[in-house]
C-alpha cells in the first residue's frame, strides 16, 4: 500500500514528484487516501481488482464453562471493480514554446486540476455502465445498504427546529458506520447549509490544515467540499479511510502517475504532452461508508 505523498517521495523524476505534490496539496481526498498498489501494468489486457467486502461482521458471544464456543460467520460479498486510466493531453506549437515559455506550467497546472475534478466526480458518482472506461464510485457501492439514509428535513428555510432535526439525523447516520468517519464529502451548496446549521446550533468549528486550507468540521469530522460539479446533489457521503475500509487502487512499482512533456526534437510543428493517473477505489466493508441523501423534492 502507498499514499500519493509516499509516491512523490519515491518518484524517479522531479517532474512527476512536483506534479503529485501539487495534487496532494490541492486535494485533501487524494492526499488522505491509501492506495493498494498491487496491479501490474504489463501482462494483462485489463485492469481489474477483486476483493471481499464484509456486509455483516462476525458476532462474538459468551459461552458457558465446559461448552464449545458458538460459531459465527460473516456475510461476505465478492466484488470485482475496474481500475481506470485517468488522463489529460494537450497540444503546444513550437512557436508558442519560444514565445510563451510559461505555457508549460499552465498546461501542467490545468492537467492537474482536470485530473482532480474528474477523480472527485468519479469517486462519488462513477458507474461503469455509464462510462465503461471509468470506475465505480461510492454512490453505487452504498446504494440500498444499511448505511444508505434519506433525510426527512427540509433545509430550504433553516431554523433551530430543523437544525436540531438535521443534527439528530446526522447522529443516526454516523452511528450506523463501523467507526467515526474520517471525512464527509459534500457539494459546495451543502457545505453552506451545514455551516449555517452549525452556527445556529453553536457548534461551528473552522481550523486551518497543514496546506493552509480553511477546514470546517461536523462534530470533529472534516467536511470536504467537492467543487466544479463533482457532486451535484445535497447528499452527504461519509467514509472511513483505510485498507479495511475505503481506499484507492493503483499500479505497483510507483507507476500510478506519469507525466510526459512534448519532444521538441521530433519533426512537426505541434507537439503533445500528457498526464495520467491510474486509479480506482474499493470499499472493503459496507459500514465503512454511507450516504445521507437530501430530502426528495415534493
What are these regions (language model features)?
Residues 46-54, 72-143, 175-193, 260-281:
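Long, contiguous amphipathic alpha-helices that act as assembly "spine/axial" helices in icosahedral shell
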Residues 173-174, 224:
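A generic local secondary-structure boundary/capping motif
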Residues 2-36, 43-45, 101-102, 135-165, ...:
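Sequence/fold signature of self-assembling virion shell proteins
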Residues 167-172:
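Phosphate-interacting basic helix/loop segments used at nucleotide- and nucleic-acid interfaces
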Residues 2-89, 131:
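Assembly/oligomerization interface modules of large self-assembling protein complexes
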Amino acid at each position: 500500500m502507498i499514499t500519493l505523498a509516499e509516491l512523490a517521495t519515491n518518484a524517479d523524476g522531479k517532474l512527476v514528484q512536483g506534479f503529485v505534490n501539487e495534487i496532494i496539496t490541492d486535494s485533501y481526498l487524494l492526499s488522505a487516501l491509501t492506495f493498494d498498489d498491487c496491479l501490474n501494468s504489463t501482462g494483462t489486457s485489463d485492469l481489474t481488482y477483486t476483493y471481499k467486502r464484509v456486509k455483516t461482521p462476525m458476532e462474538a458471544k459468551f459461552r458457558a464453562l465446559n461448552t464449545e464456543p458458538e460459531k459465527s460467520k460473516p456475510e461476505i460479498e465478492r466484488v470485482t471493480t475496474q481500475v481506470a486510466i485517468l488522463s489529460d493531453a494537450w497540444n503546444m506549437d513550437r512557436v508558442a514554446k519560444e514565445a510563451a515559455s510559461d505555457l508549460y506550467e499552465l498546461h501542467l497546472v490545468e492537467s492537474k486540476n482536470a485530473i482532480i475534478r474528474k477523480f472527485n466526480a468519479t469517486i462519488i458518482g462513477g458507474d461503469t455502465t455509464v462510462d465503461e472506461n471509468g470506475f465505480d464510485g461510492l454512490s453505487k457501492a452504498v446504494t440500498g445498504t444499511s448505511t444508505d439514509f434519506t433525510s426527512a428535513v427540509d433545509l430550504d428555510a433553516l431554523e433551530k427546529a430543523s437544525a436540531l432535526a438535521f443534527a439528530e439525523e446526522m447522529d443516526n447516520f454516523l452511528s450506523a458506520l463501523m467507526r467515526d468517519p474520517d471525512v464527509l464529502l459534500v457539494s459546495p451548496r451543502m457545505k453552506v447549509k451545514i455551516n449555517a446549521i452549525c452556527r445556529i446550533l453553536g457548534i461551528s468549528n473552522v481550523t486551518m490544515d497543514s496546506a493552509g486550507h480553511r477546514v470546517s468540521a461536523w462534530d470533529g469530522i472534516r467536511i470536504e467540499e467537492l467543487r466544479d460539479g463533482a457532486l451535484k446533489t445535497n447528499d452527504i457521503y461519509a467514509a472511513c479511510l483505510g485498507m479495511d475500509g475505503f481506499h484507492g487502487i493503483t499500479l505497483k512499482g510507483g507507476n500510478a502517475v506519469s507525466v510526459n512533456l512534448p519532444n521538441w526534437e521530433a519533426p512537426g510543428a505541434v507537439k503533445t504532452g500528457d498526464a495520467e493517473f491510474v486509479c480506482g477505489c474499493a470499499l472493503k466493508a459496507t459500514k465503512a461508508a454511507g450516504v445521507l441523501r437530501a430530502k426528495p423534492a415534493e
